[in-house]
A protein has these predicted regions:
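Active-site donor-binding acidic/aromatic loop of nucleotide-activated sugar
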Residues: 176-184
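Short, acidic/turn-prone active-site loops that include or flank metal/cofactor-
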Residues: 43-44, 224-227, 247-249
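Conserved donor-nucleotide binding/catalytic region of nucleotide-linked donor-dependent transferases
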Residues: 237, 241-242, 247-248, 252, ...
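A donor-sugar binding/catalytic signature common to diverse glycosyltransferases
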Residues: 184-235
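Short internal beta-strands
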Residues: 152-158
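Short hydrophobic alpha-helical runs that function as membrane-insertion/retention elements
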Residues: 155, 220-222, 242-244
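Nucleotide-sugar-dependent glycosyltransferase catalytic domains
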Residues: 1-150, 162-177, 272, 276-279, ...
Length: 316
């Protein structure tokens, strides 16, 4: 859970694992029951996500999760002896080739050599732009470019039918040279870990927030619904970024003013805060820490009639 639930919601509940970091939200850790564990952002083992189906051996391979590094920025894996070298080489080779051919990475590399910084915008896969929203963001980016000309924009806009997203296609848009629009990002980690990335603008989604947090990237949130407003509050409370005053509206003045502050006026302050919280994410334990908690709890409790769904006599 990103939004830490109340203990005792289920008769089987003995603990809660929160993907948040202690003190990240507006409540002190002591406000929570002692059965709540803050482990920070969690990610799937990176090696399992890299290769295409064609690059995986046809025979089944059992991977050892205990020996894997679950860090979002470190890639190591070990497998049983029979497939160890072969599978790891396949995965690393596929990942290296994919990065070499990734046009987004090539563009970001070039931006870095030209001393440019990048703002990454991703409002989520289920977000549909109205024409007004789209034009307002363009207007905000135009103002930003005049104020902070060294910032380029990588804007991810999902493809949707025009009857639900009535905006120009990439070909129709005729965007200025400082904006690169993509309908899909091949590898989000490549973007978030790239040294040219200066900030991430998003809708307050759990993935967008956690991924940027784990990579130490300053954030700007234009929250859109339900829990995204809470995440906007987390971002401002922790000092890692800013939250649009007019959310969920895309007000050009509001957006451009916040982005100028985030990317220029107070950039070092936000950057240092984001890097500090990145270290706290590592310290919280992440996926490996969550695994340890789950395994220890499983070893500590007896299942009634060997049924894990049975109520625990000593549940919260």
């Amino acid at each position: 859970s990103v939004m830490t639930p109340t203990p005792g919601m289920l008769p089987q509940q003995i603990a809660t694992i929160s993907f948040n970091v202690a003190n990240m939200d507006v409540y002190p850790p002591e406000a929570y029951h002692n059965s709540v564990y803050f482990v920070g952002p969690c990610f799937a083992p990176k090696q399992l996500l890299m290769p295409s189906a064609r690059s995986i051996p046809s025979s089944p391979v059992s991977l050892s999760f205990r020996s894997m590094d679950f860090s979002p920025s470190v890639s190591t894996a070990t497998t049983p002896v029979g497939a160890d070298g072969f599978l790891e080489k396949q995965m690393l080779s596929a990942h290296a080739v994919a990065q070499m051919q990734d046009p987004v990475k090539i563009w970001m590399d070039r931006a870095m050599t030209e001393n440019k910084r990048i703002l990454y915008i991703n409002m989520g896969s289920i977000f549909f732009y109205s024409l007004e929203d789209y034009n307002n963001i363009l207007h905000a980016l135009e103002i930003l470019h005049k104020e902070v000309p060294d910032v380029l924009v990588l804007w991810k806009v999902s493809n949707h039918p025009k009857n639900v997203q009535p905006i120009p296609t990439v070909e129709e848009a005729d965007l200025p040279s400082y904006i690169r629009r993509e309908h899909w990002i091949p590898d989000v980690e490549v973007v978030l870990s790239h040294p040219s990335l200066a900030a991430s603008m998003h809708h307050g989604g759990g993935n967008s927030y956690n991924e940027a947090l784990a990579h130490g990237v300053p954030q700007f949130c234009v929250s859109q619904w339900v829990d995204t407003h809470d995440i906007g509050l987390y971002i401002t409370h922790s000092g890692i970024g800013l939250w649009a005053d007019q959310s969920p509206k895309f007000d050009p003045t509001d957006i451009s003013t916040k982005l100028v502050r985030l990317l220029q006026t107070d950039y070092k302050t936000f950057r240092h805060a984001a890097l500090s919280w990145k270290l706290k994410c590592i310290q919280a334990g992440g996926t490996a820490g969550a695994v340890e908690i789950i395994e220890n709890l499983l070893r500590s409790y007896d299942f009634v009639n060997n049924d894990s769904k049975a109520p625990f006599p000593d549940a919260i």
